[in-house]
Amino acid sequence: MKDVKALKLMTLNDVLSQINGDMTLGIGTGSTMELLLPQMAQLIKERGYNITGVCTSNKIAFLAKELGIKICEINDVDHIDLAIDGADEVDPSLNIIKGGGGALFREKVIDEMASRFVVVVDETKIVQYLGETFKLPVEVDKFNWYHILRKIESYADIKVERRVNEDVAFITDNGNYILDCKLPKGIDPYKFHEYLIHLTGVFETGYFLDMADQVIVGTQEGVKILEK
């Protein structure tokens, strides 16, 4: 049986085949993207592609630069041809939860801006409903985070925790906190997102709804391509 890393590696050729010529790429955050970056850098070098990357986190931008990938800021580009990113969950409608790496706001900005958004996952990320195996991240202002937590818990039977890293509150690249929400089955993601995004102090949610054009899945039986 292949482990999770092996399943992710299986997907990379299908991703790389979509990169060509002169493109502006949105480069996501997470373990899958860290596996993809070295192969992407090699492809760009071997084929002489004129690729510019726009990164969703400071960590990924640093890694990309180290590998020789040309990087620019989001405000320096007018469009993104292709965004490539991982996901924490994917449901049957190709709606996803992201934000396990804490970069959900920048990921959403870049993924929404892209002409095409491709998601790369292993089969453990495929679920029947959002929140089945992964908590929904919500990026919030540090000033009133606890009051937001209480309001989220009052919406339904939801357990909310402020994310910590080695006993210290996790801080996003935007200087905010992350609240991780354990969702019960039956929560409507569209309605819940609307509730959250209108709470004062909520920066963004980890719901990426109606955004993915294609999901590439590494499975024990091989690579599966999911499209709407």
Curated annotation (Swiss-Prot):
Isomerase as UniProt keyword: yes
Keywords, ordered alphabetically: Isomerase
Pathway given in the UniProt record: Carbohydrate degradation; pentose phosphate pathway; D-ribose 5-phosphate from D-ribulose 5-phosphate (non-oxidative stage): step 1/1
GO-annotated molecular function: ribose-5-phosphate isomerase activity
GO cellular component: cytosol
Pfam families in UniProt: Rib_5-P_isom_A
Source species, domain of life: Bacteria
Enzyme Commission code(s) on record: 5.3.1.6
Residue numbers binding substrate: 29-32, 85-88, 98-101, 125
Coiled-coil blocks: none
Reaction(s) the record says it catalyses: aldehydo-D-ribose 5-phosphate = D-ribulose 5-phosphate
Active site: 107 (proton acceptor)
Gene Ontology annotations of biological process type: D-ribose metabolic process; pentose-phosphate shunt, non-oxidative branch
Complex formation: Homodimer.
Record function comment: Catalyzes the reversible conversion of ribose-5-phosphate to ribulose 5-phosphate.
Matches recorded under NCBIfam families: PRK00702.1, PRK13978.1, rpiA
UniProt similarity note: Belongs to the ribose 5-phosphate isomerase family.
Protein name: Ribose-5-phosphate isomerase A
Lineage: Bacteria, Bacillati, Bacillota, Bacilli, Bacillales
